[in-house]
Amino acid sequence: FVVVPPQIYYEHIAEYTGYFDFYKTVFNFVPYPEGSFSWHHLWFILYLLLYSLLLIPFFNYIRSERSEKFRATVSRWLSSPAGMLLIPSVIIIFTQAILRPYFPDETHDLTDLGFFVFYMCFFFFGVLFYSDRNLWLAIGQNRKHLLVAALFVLIPFYLLYFHFRGIVTFPWPEDTIETLFDITGMFMSWFTVLTV
């Protein structure tokens, strides 16, 4: 009620006599863009709340003794640089291959299931890595490998980006180039999160 309303007011400044005239409309709770109620760039706060609520059963399980075998298996699979880079990336890409054809736009509202699941994967894997001391240490021990991988994936990402800007030309259909760009972007996102 403090950060976002000035942004909405500025977008509709010609419709109101002043800020306080506008601010009253925020409490009508009419969703943006028809109304003045929105989370705008604070969408991630609602997403984090929903992820936390949806994953409560997983949080409880991962902290219980029943998860010992699961954690050992996950630790074994994800503790190598290749495992920690590729397994989560492939899962993230798989979710997007299924969802993005139906939810292609990044709107950050509650009907944006494609990007909601995309960011939830990051949240889930973050919890998974943090919950296992060996995995957490493996990230630190393999930081150089992770950095090299993150830098390496920038090459195809920017080549494809430059194609869209007309600097580089590829002979493939635009749909193929957009798909490759999205895939390299997902790899780059996960690799960068692990590196940082």
Regions found by a protein language model. Give the residues of each.
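Alpha-helical transmembrane segments and their immediate juxtamembrane cytosolic regions
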Residues: 1-196
